[in-house]
Amino acid sequence: MDMVSLKFIGIGLMAIGMYGAALGVSNIFSSLLSSIARNPSAAENLQRMALIGAGLAEAMGLFSFVIAMLLIFS
């Protein structure tokens, strides 16, 4: 295989990181909704923690996207 083929295989594998971020965010918010349904008085605190967690999960997806773009254009 030449280097261009290996580069595109690496870019395809970076999609796993973006898939993982999407799964993480969906898991965070489904847990948030079930937790608020059980204990509505803690909704404000739970929502704050869920948004921080979702931001961190999205950051992993964005890092993976940036690395994929660097691989494409380098």
Curated annotation (Swiss-Prot):
One of the record's GO molecular function terms: lipid binding
Signal peptide: none
Membrane spanning residue stretches: 8-28, 52-72
Physiological role: F(1)F(0) ATP synthase produces ATP from ADP in the presence of a proton or sodium gradient. F-type ATPases consist of two structural domains, F(1) containing the extramembraneous catalytic core and F(0) containing the membrane proton channel, linked together by a central stalk and a peripheral stalk. During catalysis, ATP synthesis in the catalytic domain of F(1) is coupled via a rotary mechanism of the central stalk subunits to proton translocation. Key component of the F(0) channel; it plays a direct role in translocation across the membrane. A homomeric c-ring of between 10-14 subunits forms the central stalk rotor element with the F(1) delta and epsilon subunits.
This protein's name: ATP synthase subunit c
InterPro entries with a match to the protein in the record: ATP_synth_F0_csu, ATP_synth_F0_csu_DDCD_BS, ATP_synth_F0_csu_sf, ATPase_proteolipid_c-like_dom, F/V-ATP_Csub_sf
Any single Pfam family the record assigns to this protein: ATP-synt_C
Subcellular location: Cell inner membrane
Membrane topology: Multi-pass membrane protein
PROSITE patterns listed in its UniProt record: ATPASE_C
CDD domains given in the database record: ATP-synt_Fo_c_ATP5G3
GO cellular component: plasma membrane; proton-transporting ATP synthase complex; proton-transporting two-sector ATPase complex, proton-transporting domain
Primary localization: membrane
Subunit structure, as described in the record: F-type ATPases have 2 components, F(1) - the catalytic core - and F(0) - the membrane proton channel. F(1) has five subunits: alpha(3), beta(3), gamma(1), delta(1), epsilon(1). F(0) has three main subunits: a(1), b(2) and c(10-14). The alpha and beta chains form an alternating ring which encloses part of the gamma chain. F(1) is attached to F(0) by a central stalk formed by the gamma and epsilon chains, while a peripheral stalk is formed by the delta and b chains.
Site feature: Reversibly protonated during proton transport: 58
Origin: domain of life: Bacteria
Keywords, alphabetical: ATP synthesis, Cell inner membrane, Cell membrane, CF(0), Hydrogen ion transport, Ion transport, Lipid-binding, Membrane, Transmembrane, Transmembrane helix, Transport
Family named by the database record: Belongs to the ATPase C chain family.
Tagged with keyword Coiled coil: no
Transmembrane keyword on record: yes
Source species of the chain: Rickettsia felis (strain ATCC VR-1525 / URRWXCal2)
